[in-house]
Regions:
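Divalent metal-coordination and catalytic microenvironments
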Residues: 17, 29, 56, 68, ...
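Active-site neighborhood of phospho(di)ester-bond hydrolases with catalytic His/Asp-centered motifs
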Residues: 27-30, 48-58, 77-80, 110-113, ...
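Active-site metal-binding motif and surrounding structural segment of the metallo-beta-lactamase
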Residues: 34-77
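Conserved beta-strand hairpin/beta-sheet module of binuclear metal-dependent hydrolase folds
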Residues: 1-48, 121-138, 144
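Divalent-metal (often Zn2+) His-rich catalytic cores of metallo-beta-lactamase-fold enzymes
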Residues: 128-129, 133-134, 144, 156-249
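Short glycine-enriched, charge-decorated loop/helix-capping segments at active-site entrances
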Residues: 149-156
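Active-site environment of divalent metal-dependent phosphoester hydrolases
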Residues: 34, 57-62, 83-86, 116-117, ...
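Active-site-adjacent scaffolding segments
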Residues: 82, 89-148
Length: 249
């Protein structure tokens, strides 16, 4: 397996990984304007991109996912809850679905809370075993923090859902499993994010202050001091729902 993490605009972290041997790659959370980088890195690895995934409809940056998928002829994926919401064709993801890229396999975990459509991606290298190597956590779990719950409205209800998601879907994963989040310090998508670009489930269970709280305390803490919403959020979300990035992006 090859793996690339790309720091991008708005403290976003994007990903490219795949199987060089069988020449297939996966791109995750591509920021508009970075499409050439993904194409060039995939070419260097000798692994054409076959899957492009957004972990949710982003509110803080324009997605380059649809454009990258069009340029390379790959499937573009969002969670199935976006059917009827997104104004263009995409390949829907369902909880428990498995995507293949040669010997690299991606297991989809539906993780609502930050947004209703959020997913995390547990990644395996079948040449080395059937256990996951890492999980891409999108805006659900960050290093030292968790995703904000208010972007879809009903922040207390979403915060409670995020607590349930974290406890049942992510913290039950092996403690040694690496996590790669969708943002690092400087992002508007959460409060108190670390500048570290990666962690493990076990480290976060021990040191992430949001993960040792009761459900009631978690909801209260997460909704007490919500950061300002991302600049131009409404326009960004609308563009990402249409799959058309403005020329100013």
């Amino acid at each position: 397996m090859f793996f690339r993490q790309r720091p991008a605009a708005n403290a976003t972290l994007s990903y490219l990984f795949g199987c060089a041997g069988l020449q297939k790659a996966v791109a995750v959370d591509v920021v508009a304007g970075d499409e050439d980088w993904f194409i060039e890195e995939a070419q260097r690895a000798g692994a054409p991109i076959v899957h492009v995934i957004d972990t949710h409809v982003h509110a803080d940056h324009y997605s380059g996912g649809p454009e990258l998928a069009r340029r390379v002829g790959a499937a573009y994926h969002l969670h199935e809850s976006n059917i009827g919401r997104v104004g263009f064709d995409f390949s829907p993801l369902r909880d428990g679905q498995r995507l293949e890229a040669g010997n690299v396999v991606v297991d989809v975990i539906h993780t609502p809370g930050h947004t209703p459509d959020s997913v995390c991606l547990a990644v395996r290298d079948l040449r080395r075993g059937d256990e996951p190597w890492f999980v891409i956590t999108g805006d659900t779990l960050f290093v030292g923090a968790v995703g904000r719950p208010d972007l879809a409205g009903q922040e207390r209800e979403m915060a409670a859902q995020l607590y349930d998601t974290l406890q049942s879907r992510l913290l039950s994963l092996p403690p040694e499993l690496e996590i790669y989040p969708g943002h690092q310090a400087g992002s508007a998508c959460g409060a108190g994010l670390s500048g570290k670009p990666a962690s493990t489930i076990g480290f976060e269970k021990r040191f992430n202050p949001m993960l040792s709280m009761s459900r009631e305390a978690f909801v209260t803490a997460l909704t007490a001091e919500i950061p300002p919403q991302p600049e131009d959020m409404a326009r960004i979300v609308e563009a990402n729902l249409r799959g058309v990035v403005p020329a100013i992006a």
